[in-house]
Amino acid sequence: RTSAAAELIEKVKFSAVKGNISEIKALMGVSAQTKGVDAAEGDSGSADDAAELAKSFSKKTGAITVITGKVDIITDGKRVFKIYNGAPLMKSVTGTGCMLSALLGAFLAANKENMLEAAAAAVCMMGICGEKALARMKKEDGNSSYRNYIIDAVYNFSEIDMEAAKYEL
């Protein structure tokens, strides 16, 4: 999978590339301990370290880099957004990364003039939806309920909800 992704990045000009820290490290040729689509504990470092890696990757590829994790990093190689929205339970739900990819594609396509900001907004939205879903959880709910609550939060998301965005630039 990594070699196929690396080959695509060499041949195609992507607007954005999203991955967890282990995936981006692997694409940069840095030693990584990937576990399928999950980030390895040994690969996680500080948000500042992730930001530097993301900036290097963006400069190498010309794409906006999105690294998902406890703190999400979005950069064009110059400016860096750190996003603090989200909930730990999100990593226990298969498909949240795919949901974010869909949001990124939609936000980037709709805002080609400000793609970095569009990517940051998509990541904030997904994180806010994760928080809203967590707030709906009852003691007897499991990760399947949580997944459905995330989907509901995306469906019902409004401009007002974006006021819950927690980020720094």
What are these model-derived regions, one by one?
Residues 53-58, 115-129, 150-151:
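Short, well-structured alpha-helical segments that form the helix of a local strand-helix-strand
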Residues 64, 90-92, 100:
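Short, flexible coil/turn micro-motifs enriched in small/turn-prone residues
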Residues 26, 94-124:
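Short, small-residue alpha-helix embedded
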